[in-house]
């Protein structure tokens, strides 16, 4: 799709909307084409990262607000690496945040950062972003130890896993920001990678730090969906 460039995140978010709207137009048209021509009523998992997660959130808003749309086949929306605010939920009152490992039709979201971080491009200061802890699949603020981390996986540009580290880090949800704070990561070892992020913003690692937990969870939610809906193929 015609992805908005990194420059779109260096200006006010409202000013960036025309560029993001172009990106979303492509994503929505592609999704509609798939649903109308290939889906055949099978359950769907939506997943995105960063701008892609913003696109997934927009899709979820549209189809939960549209009568007769595809909400009945949505297993879950993984909005990883983008904020989900109360304003977002108010715009689409049928949307809900995930609260466990198996609830369906819900949004799974988190933004990973060091405990010292107080603001980022993704979650600005004084903004609360709803999250779930991928180590416990709970929305409370209790710290979860690294032994609950099934494995961080790091990949090359082809997507191939080049390194896996079991029990990589623990994490907790920040009660003020709603972000996911990691407890066992050295910012010097995992730099932000982009100039728009300060040290300790682990945006680029959101999926990687919790890879195996996320992988397992997709299966859990699909199984839950199929059980509730009395069987069916997965697409």
Q: Which residues are covered by each model-predicted region?
A:
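Second-shell loop/turn segments in exported
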Residues: 9-21, 200-204
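Surface cap/lid and interfacial helix-loop subdomains adjacent to catalytic sites
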Residues: 26-40, 61-224, 228-233
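Gly/Ala-rich beta-loop-alpha elbow adjacent to hydrolase catalytic centers
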Residues: 47-56
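Active-site machinery of serine-nucleophile hydrolases
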Residues: 1-8
């Amino acid at each position: 799709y015609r992805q908005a460039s990194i420059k779109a995140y260096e200006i006010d978010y409202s000013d960036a909307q025309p560029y993001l709207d172009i990106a979303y137009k492509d994503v929505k048209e592609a999704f509609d084409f798939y649903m109308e021509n290939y889906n055949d009523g099978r359950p769907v998992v939506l997943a995105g990262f960063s701008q892609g997660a913003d696109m997934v959130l927009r899709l979820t808003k549209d189809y939960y607000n549209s009568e007769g749309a595809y909400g009945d086949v949505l297993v879950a929306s993984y909005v990883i690496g983008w904020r989900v605010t109360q304003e977002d939920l108010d715009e689409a009152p049928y949307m809900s945040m995930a609260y466990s490992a198996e609830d369906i039709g819900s949004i799974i979201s988190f933004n990973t950062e060091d405990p010292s971080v107080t603001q980022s491009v993704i979650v600005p200061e004084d903004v609360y972003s709803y999250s779930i802890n991928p180590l416990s699949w709970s929305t409370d603020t209790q710290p979860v130890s690294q032994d609950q981390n099934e494995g961080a996986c790091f990949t090359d540009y082809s997507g191939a896993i080049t390194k896996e580290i079991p029990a990589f880090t623990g994490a907790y949800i920040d009660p003020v920001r709603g972000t996911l704070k990691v407890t066992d990561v050295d910012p010097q070892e995992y730099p932000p990678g982009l100039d728009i992020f300060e040290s300790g913003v682990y945006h680029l690692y959101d999926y990687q730090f919790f890879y195996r937990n996320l992988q397992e969870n997709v299966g859990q939610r699909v199984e839950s969906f199929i059980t509730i809906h009395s069987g069916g193929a997965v697409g």
